[in-house]
Amino acid sequence: MTQSEKIINLTNHYGAHNYVPLPIVISEAEGVWVKDPEGNTYMDMLSAYSAVNQGHRHPRIIQALKDQADKVTLVSRAFHSDNLGQWYEKICKLAGKDKALPMNTGAEAVETALKAARRWAYDVKGIEPNKAEIIAFNGNFHGRTMAPVSLSSEAEYQRGYGPLLDGFRKVEFGDVNQLKAAINKNTAAILVEPIQGEAGINVPPEGYLKTIRELCDEHQILFIADEIQAGLGRSGKLFATDWDHVKPDVYILGKALGGGVFPISVVLADNEVLDVFTPGSHGSTFGGNPLASAVSIAAIDVIIDEDLPGRSLELGEYFKSELKKIEHPSIKEVRGRGLFIGIELHESARPYCEALKEQGLLCKETHDTVIRFAPPLVITKEELDMALEKIKSVFA
């Protein structure tokens, strides 16, 4: 029995079976490359669902982690820390927003944004207490906690977790008429992924996000953009909403905000929204801790200094155009933006992901029939060409 097999057996014995990972153990990583305990090398084309946009163990981010770990790692929000304000300033200026509220995981940030939207609805918009509604979209994925589960359109995500939370409406992604029909006097917010990731890399029709912006302005509704996976350069723009030249009222960021090193997420909005929170109304023991702040400052600097959005745009266009040249009866469509690309198949994508793993390329199926490609944004054209050869071989 190999070391990898021993580790997988141990994991399966003691761990809850809420994931079905590919049968590979990763023990080392650098840049776009990972290794298993046996020394086999693989190209990472998933980036931990976009958490590793800057590449595995980016030296600037690792150095920031080490330097901060030698000073102080956690004080809780009961006290001030010396780098939280610096991080606030950097992330607020990046997004063009007045304030930031830090959390740890993406799901926590989504919950925070929903709480902010509801309290804003009552305190600012004047909706009758306990009547606020939030509109989301079929195919959405905003996390695994109760609010995101309640607004999901996937039955399996909800099975056995009732009673679900009230106050959510769902419409078809990209359908303007359904969206307009769902709006009423109690609508507090529209929550949208600018590109739906888990649903299969679904890109909205051109101008759809602009329509959402216009409807929100017309009806005094908050436009909340969940940019956890598509943001911070993944789509070829700093924010995926930039494709429609719109600015949401609320950004939700996570994943790459921690540089693949430490979990940190944030809700960004102007004073009118985040000032609804008063002392004791929301919080997080670890949110905005010194270690996370230091890592995130470095992670943001890498995104900007290395122009990762620009790299994603240029290389993504090349990668997508080459994928579209592959002719195979199983391929239904190739779609995406930047280095956030899906190949939709007429059959299950899992066998293709397993075949690619045997070829030394790691990716993951999503929505059963879509192969998702989201490599670290530091990938080179030469490395993409290597990936293309492997992808072509499994469709030969």
Curated annotation (Swiss-Prot):
Recorded E.C. number(s)? 2.6.1.13
Q: Which keywords, in A-to-Z order, does the entry hold?
A: Amino-acid biosynthesis, Aminotransferase, Cytoplasm, Proline biosynthesis, Pyridoxal phosphate, Transferase
Membrane-crossing ranges are: none
CDD domains named among the record's database cross-references = OAT_like
- Could you mention a single GO BP entry for this protein? L-proline biosynthetic process
Cofactors that this protein relies on: pyridoxal 5'-phosphate
GO cellular component terms, alphabetically, are:
cytoplasm
Instruction: Please list the residues that carry the modification N6-(pyridoxal phosphate)lysine.
Output: 255
Give the residue range of the signal peptide. none
Q: Name one Pfam family in it.
A: Aminotran_3
Entry-linked InterPro entries: Aminotrans_3, Aminotrans_3_PPA_site, Class-III_PLP-dep_AT, Orn_aminotrans, Ornith_aminotrans_bact, PyrdxlP-dep_Trfase, PyrdxlP-dep_Trfase_major, PyrdxlP-dep_Trfase_small
> Which residues are connected by disulfide bridges in this protein?
none
Is Amino-acid biosynthesis one of the keywords?
A: yes
Q: Kindly state which reaction or reactions the protein catalyses.
A: a 2-oxocarboxylate + L-ornithine = L-glutamate 5-semialdehyde + an L-alpha-amino acid
Gene3D superfamilies per the UniProt record, alphabetical: Aspartate Aminotransferase, domain 1, Type I PLP-dependent aspartate aminotransferase-like (Major domain)
Output one GO MF annotation.
ornithine aminotransferase activity
Q: Where is it located?
A: Cytoplasm
Q: In which pathway does it act?
A: Amino-acid biosynthesis; L-proline biosynthesis; L-glutamate 5-semialdehyde from L-ornithine: step 1/1
Q: What does this protein do?
A: Catalyzes the interconversion of ornithine to glutamate semialdehyde.
Similarity comment text for this entry: Belongs to the class-III pyridoxal-phosphate-dependent aminotransferase family. OAT subfamily.
Q: What is this protein called?
A: Ornithine aminotransferase
**UniProt source species:** Staphylococcus epidermidis (strain ATCC 35984 / DSM 28319 / BCRC 17069 / CCUG 31568 / BM 3577 / RP62A)
List the lineage, top down.
Answer: Bacteria, Bacillati, Bacillota, Bacilli, Bacillales
Its gene is rocD
